[in-house]
Amino acid sequence: MLITVPLAGELKFYPLNEEFRVSFGAPVFFFFLSLLRHVPAVLPGFLTGAAVFIFRVFLELWGGGHNGLTPILYDQASGFFFYMTYACLFSILKANRFRERPIMLGFIGFMIEVVSDCVELTVQFLIFHTVVTPEKITDIAVIAISHTFIVMSFYSVLKLYETQSREKQTRQQHEHMLMIVSNLYEETVHLKKTLKTTEKVTNDSYQLYREMKGKDVQLSGRILRLAGEIHEVKKDNQRIFAGLSKLISNESLRDYMRASDLLQLVIRMNEKYAEALGKQIDFYCSIEGEHDEYHVFIVLSIINNLTANAVEAMDEEGMVSLRLRKPNESMVEFQVEDNGPGISEKIGDIVFDPGFTSKYDEFGTPSTGIGLSYVKEIVTELEGDITFDNQQRGVVFAIRLPVRHLIQKG
């Protein structure tokens, strides 16, 4: 402010008399004051007025043509009073409280500039006995309106940029939270399967205990203790499952989203994933027909798994295409296609088996191999089916699900 305002003040003209200048210093000063949050406007006003005064005196001395320092000081004194008056009125009226109301802020800025110009003219009248007429006041008002328009234009552009940046940040946080909750949803599915398994093992152990009770007391006792330990594991898993379910249900996120928004969300997340892996992947999206809002976490956990697998399977460059259509009114079909290496025929029968993987890191460590098995499990649980079809280059995964499991009930 202390540098910009004096420099902007040199873009000037003299519409009223040889002493009263109109420059871009006033709108620039107004713009800076409107950005201040916690600093009282009086202090910046005093410092800016002093900086403008000193800068103008220096320029006059540098240019020469004056009879000593005193006339120069008189010539430039009125500018200091303009900025001081401007800052004091800005502080008294607490103009910054209207930061979110640009029209009101602009009106206050207009009034402040008119009053400050009148103070400057008054100082010049006291020093140089210049004449102040109603026509001059009218000219001042017109100039103040133009200054206010310029400042409010820049201010509105700045506020728009801030709003867009805030909206982008909020969207990124929302997408990140959706991804976290989607991953938690995936873990609850695995945990639910574990609960069923431990329940079955507990029952089988207890039945074995009852069969061995009359035959081998020592062995039956060990079996009973084992059944009890498994039962404790089951209860621990139940507590974890309940906590995860509560956490997912309590998140202030939408459970249902438009199909187009869901697929775009998958694409944005996997664009970042591909970039993190150092790969150049082009993503495409195609939606046929009309679709309801679908369950966010079900769709994300399925489609994002398949899309991430496609990204991982490709080399440096590739293409992934997401398609959505309705074969009929009761079914919806998602397709994930890539132009990667595809799936060889000899592993086609075991590709959905838990633990199977064809992906290894740079150290030769295999991945967990639970992604496709999870997708298969959740699709089966939703009464759907999943298939894959090798193309000339790449593979297409097709997931068909009943619409009733994806849309909001009622």
From Swiss-Prot:
Enzyme superclass (EC): transferase
What Enzyme Commission number(s) appear in the record? 2.7.13.3
Q: Does the keyword Transferase apply?
A: yes
Question: Does Cytoplasm show up as a keyword for this record?
Answer: no
Ranges that cross the membrane: 16-36, 39-59, 72-92, 103-123, 140-160
One Gene Ontology cellular component term attached to this UniProt record is: plasma membrane
Instruction: Give all Phosphohistidine modified positions.
Output: H190
BP GO annotations? phosphorelay signal transduction system
Q: Which GO terms describe its molecular function?
A: ATP binding; protein histidine kinase activity
Extracellular compartment: which residues?
A: 1-15, 60-71, 124-139
Give the SMART domains listed for this entry.
HATPase_c
Q: How would you describe this protein's topology in the membrane?
A: Multi-pass membrane protein
Query: Effect of gene disruption?
Result: In the absence of nitrogen source, cells lacking this gene do not show degradation of TnrA, which is entirely soluble.
Cross-referenced InterPro entries: 2C_sensor_his_kinase, HATPase_C_sf, His_kinase_dom, Sig_transdc_His_kin-like_C
Swiss-Prot/TrEMBL catalytic activity: ATP + protein L-histidine = ADP + protein N-phospho-L-histidine
Instruction: Please report the name of this protein according to its UniProt entry.
Output: Sensor histidine kinase GlnK
Q: Which gene encodes it?
A: glnK
